Amino acid sequence: MKKGLLGAAAFFLATALLTSCGSKKVPSYNELDVEQYVTLGDYYNLGLTLEIESQIKQLMQNVYHSGMPAEDGFTGRPVELGDGVDIDYEGKKDGVAFAGGTAQGAFLSIGSGQFIDGFEDGLVGVMPGETVDLDLTFPVWYDNSDLAGQAVVFTVTVNYILPEEQDMKDSVVEGMGMDEINTVAALREDVFDYLYYYSSELEFAQDDVLMALLDICTFAEELPQDFVDEARKMFRTDLEKQAAYYGMTTEEAAQALGAMSEEEFLKARAEQNVRGNLAMQAVANREGLSVSDDELQELLELSVSSGEFKSVEEFLEYYNFTREQYRNLVMVDKVLKFLLYLQDTI
């Protein structure tokens, strides 16, 4: 389920110090005594709440469903909104079953919107073991022209309701044969890892968790100047590109971005970037987070296969990274994910 690419906030944060005016002689945060520049606050309690629990539940149940025995399903109450259910169904138009409208032992999360309007709502209140006929109509924009706008009948049997996370069994997860995922807790973490890359809620939350971390940290008045200078170069290059695109001077572009002047813009952006990287590395140091050579190589190869590059070397050259600079970028991503996983979910 793991994607192996990088979250948007991590990429923006790290590349500000990894790419600068074509120079590859860039200092590395993992070689810096960051604790002399930053004092961490209580990052286990950032006060953020992530509205992703329904997504976590749906994905966990979907994966769990593929390996659970039917006798572990619940049958003693009617279906409710938010339940995951195992169903058999057959769809008919004018009394004739249509292609793609029949399945046995299918997983469905009630309320997910996976099926056409009325299908999932029609199962709310149905007891496991019961069969119902649902008179429905396909939307006019449905991609199958033979069914678009047509009235159909789905005959659906609810077989059982899937267990909630607290009722899932480690033995079932272990029996699925997934590498390094042998417990329910590990399954949840893997699902969260997947959502980190694909959920819009978590994408937006990356910025929130970074700002919350900066708010509870204390920074030295004097930041490491080499790092500030490198960040400043990158932001100047970026500002020049934006100014050229919009036909502005760099001073005008900086003011359009809310700064009083170009100098103010570059100073503020560079120093904020350095503070963010210092805090991230400090968390990594305290938590023992690292990126091994094997992990780095695997992620580089995934990045190559996901793009239009023929080799790791071509990928690194395109983004002007050394392997160690890319390792630093992956570390920022890992810390962001770690911090998000600590937050409350609803």
Feature annotation, model-predicted:
Residues 1-19:
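Sec-dependent bacterial lipoprotein signal peptides
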Residues 21-346:
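FKBP-type peptidyl-prolyl cis-trans isomerases
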